[in-house]
C-alpha cells in the first residue's frame, strides 16, 4: 500500500496544498487565495478528501496556539488578519479528515525543511515578506516552551535617517515587522516594493534592520547559519547588503562558524519550497509515531 504525505502552507494571502510520495517527492500541488475561514478551510478539506494522505504537516500564519494542554490548541489566535482571529483551524481539519496533523508556524515549517535539505541541525529561518517571522531549530528540535517565537516583533534600533516613520505593525508600530516588512516600503515611499529601483537608499535602511535581527539571533541562539527567505529577499543584492551590515555590527566580537556568505544565506530548497518540504517531514514524523 502506497503512503502519501500532505502539506498545508496556511498563509495570510494564500494557501498552498501539496501531496508527496513516501520519498517526499511532490506529486500534486494546489494554490488558492486566502479568503474567509469558512471558504478557505472548506477548500482545504475538499482537496484532502479527494487526495487521501496518511498524515499532514500544517505550517500556519499566526500567532497560533501550540500548547497541547491549552483549550485553544490548534487555533489561530490574535492575528490582525480580518475574520481569522480565534479560528480553530486544526480542530476543523481533524474532525473532517480524521488523520494526524502536525501543527506549527509557517516559518518553523520552513526551518524544518531547510534542516532536512541541508543536514544542518542548528539554524534560524527568517522570512521577510508581507510580514516577518522567524523559526529556530537547535539540535534538530524547534525552540519554544509553551508557544512559538515571535522574532518578527523584536525591538530594534531605528535608522537615523527615518526616525519619524512610525511603522506599520498594528500592535507595536516600529518593531522589526513594522519597519522592515514589505508593506513598510510602500508606506514610507508611496511606491510598491517591487517597483523601487535597486539603488534606492531604502534598501540600505531595510538591510540595517534585517541585519540587526541576524545579530540578535546570532548572540542569543548561536546557530550554524541564518537563512533569509520571503519576497523582500528576492531583490537583487539584498543578501549582500545584509551580510555587509551584519559584519559591521558584529565588529569581530565572536568568530562565525563559516564565511558570512555561508552563514547568512538564501533558502536552499528551490521555488519557495522550504515549508512544503518541512511539512512533509513533519507529517512523516507523526505517521511513523502512530
Swiss-Prot record:
Zn(2+) binds at residues 153, 169, 172, 175. ATP binds at residues 130, 183, 231-235. Keywords: ATP-binding, Carbohydrate metabolism, Kinase, Magnesium, Metal-binding, Nucleotide-binding, Transferase, Zinc. It catalyses: D-fructose + ATP = D-fructose 6-phosphate + ADP + H(+). Inactivated by EDTA. Inhibition by zinc ions (Potential). It comes from the Bacteria. Its cofactor is Mg(2+). Its EC number is 2.7.1.4. One of its GO terms (molecular function) is metal ion binding. PANTHER family: FRUCTOKINASE, TRANSCRIPTIONAL REPRESSOR MPRA. Homodimer. Belongs to the ROK (NagC/XylR) family. This is Fructokinase. The gene is scrK.
Amino acid at each position: 500500500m502506497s503512503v502519501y504525505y500532505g502539506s498545508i502552507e496556511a498563509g495570510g494571502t494564500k494557501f498552498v496544498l501539496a501531496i508527496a510520495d513516501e520519498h517526499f517527492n511532490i506529486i500534486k500541488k494546489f494554490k488558492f487565495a486566502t479568503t474567509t475561514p469558512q471558504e478557505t478551510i472548506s477548500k482545504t478539506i475538499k482537496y484532502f478528501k479527494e487526495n487521501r494522505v496518511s498524515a499532514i504537516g500544517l505550517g500556519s500564519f499566526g500567532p497560533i496556539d501550540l500548547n497541547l494542554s491549552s483549550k485553544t490548541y490548534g487555533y489561530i489566535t490574535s492575528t490582525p488578519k480580518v475574520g481569522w482571529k480565534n479560528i480553530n483551524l486544526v480542530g476543523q481539519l481533524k474532525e473532517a479528515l480524521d488523520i494526524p496533523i502536525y501543527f506549527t508556524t509557517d516559518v518553523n515549517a520552513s526551518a524544518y525543511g531547510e534542516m532536512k535539505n541541508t543536514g544542518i541541525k542548528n539554524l534560524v529561518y527568517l522570512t521577510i515578506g508581507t510580514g516577518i517571522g522567524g523559526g529556530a531549530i537547535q539540535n534538530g528540535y524547534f525552540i519554544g516552551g509553551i508557544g512559538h517565537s515571535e522574532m518578527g516583533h523584536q525591538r530594534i534600533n531605528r535608522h537615523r535617517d527615518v526616525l519619524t516613520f512610525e511603522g506599520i505593525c498594528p500592535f507595536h508600530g516600529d518593531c522589526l515587522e513594522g519597519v522592515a516588512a514589505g508593506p513598510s516600503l510602500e508606506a514610507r515611499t508611496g511606491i510598491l516594493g517591487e517597483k523601487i529601483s535597486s539603488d534606492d537608499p531604502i534598501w540600505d535602511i531595510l538591510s540595517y534592520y534585517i541585519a540587526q535581527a541576524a545579530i540578535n539571533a546570532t548572540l542569543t541562539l548561536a546557530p550554524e547559519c541564518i537563512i533569509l527567505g520571503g519576497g523582500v529577499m528576492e531583490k537583487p543584492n539584498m543578501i549582500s547588503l545584509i551580510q555587509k551590515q551584519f559584519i559591521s555590527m558584529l565588529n569581530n566580537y565572536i568568530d562565525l562558524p563559516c564565511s558570512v556568505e555561508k552563514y547568512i544565506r538564501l533558502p536552499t530548497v528551490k521555488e519557495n519550497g522550504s515549508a512544503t518540504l518541512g511539512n512533509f517531514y513533519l507529517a512523516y514524523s507523526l505517521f511513523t509515531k502512530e
